[in-house]
């Protein structure tokens, strides 16, 4: 009898009488920028021979719980620049991070590739569409590696769009040529940067660009992108263990506001992790 009476009272209540917790709409989103160095960790004593530990990479991505994850050097270059049709590291990342949608791309296959990292990925908790890729030619600057003269391979820009907080967001990811590693008379890959800026000019809505820009004198990079309407979330903290350079950036345009950011060292790579939280500007 008591149960029936309680049920009657509940049915007679209007919606205003019932205190129901309504989930608040998401108003901000988090971005993680990470050159994962194909899963090779960091060893202070012997960094060049540190073991590959993809489990540590996966743990870092999970720990930051970002809405958007931008990754560089996802795979390790194979002999003669070979590119497996099914990229093993990316495949494992997707299996372990099932909450994310993803887009992965290699740059153009090239037998001149050096035995480092290759491949870009965008991971997003919301579906991706409008995917693109654009090659970034490298100048034919001759340099020597392990006693062999060679020239650098081209680089890559990828992009995709998604809906976050009910708004459309355009996302780009890149990894530029490290001129400073070539000991060339030119210090920065200005030509590659200009192609990226050309691509950014085609977007009209909220846009962000992350990546490893490999610019040792980063203030020139920051100034160049600022003149085009893109700010970096930070330009003061070093993001690379091997040299005191600010190589990694997240740039954003005037339709986004950066609320906070962090540079966090990790044993999962020779690069630090850069995160930033954003909101859309009405």
Give names to the regions the model predicted:
Residues 1-96, 104-114, 187-195, 282:
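N-terminal, active-site-proximal structural segment of metallo-dependent hydrolase catalytic domains
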Residues 40-48, 76-78, 136-150, 176-187:
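Surface-exposed cleft-lining segments at the edges of enzyme active sites
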Residues 100-143:
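Catalytic-core segment of enzymes that process non-peptidic bonds
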Residues 20-32, 116-120, 124-129, 146, ...:
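Beta-strand-turn-beta hairpins that frame and shape the catalytic cleft
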Residues 2-19, 198-208, 213-282:
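Metal-dependent phosphoester-hydrolase catalytic domains
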Residues 83-101, 121-124, 222-234:
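Short, electropositive alpha-helical surface patch
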Residues 39-41, 76-80, 110-112, 178-182, ...:
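Active-site environment of divalent metal-dependent phosphoester hydrolases
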Residues 29-36, 57-83, 123, 160, ...:
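Active-site beta-strand/loop signature of hydrolases that rely on acidic residues for catalysis
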